Amino acid sequence: MTSSIRVPAALQEKFDTIALATDAFCDQHLNGDYKQLIRLALAALCRKRPSPLLKGQNNSWAAGAVHALGMVNFLFDDSQTPHCKATDIWAHFCLASSTGQTHSKKIRDALDMGPMDPQWSLPSHMDANPLIWMLEVNGLIVDIRQMPLEVQDIAYAKGLIPYVPGRKTGN
């Protein structure tokens, strides 16, 4: 997962305004993991040159960010916790669905997001996301969790996995 909240000074006010709106939505409907991940996405968008956030309304970008991360993490599946409907997002930010979906698509394209994207997955979804753990070792695709601890250590040192599964507490 991306981990930097660095924001260029010229976009700090824009970031703060949008993040305040997304934080309020997360506090009401989602959780702290979503709040943090959305802030990371907004910061990444601020660092793009030119930043797409320079065009459009703040509430459109806020709704788009919530929706984009929701798409990656299956927010709209009622078997997930938390979950909500896209219409709840549009209503909260007072937007038409077409506007929110357009901004969501712009964010997903700009940050190269897709379903179960390891970079944009919620921490609570890491263990269950096979895309995070499938790596090529000696020409074969393997689940790194099934490999020896030394191989897991190497994968972690290279930044290929978020943590060493064999060293995670509770294993």
Predicted regions and their residues:
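Basic, alpha-helical nucleic-acid-binding regions used in initiation and control of genome expression
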Residues: 1-59, 70-171
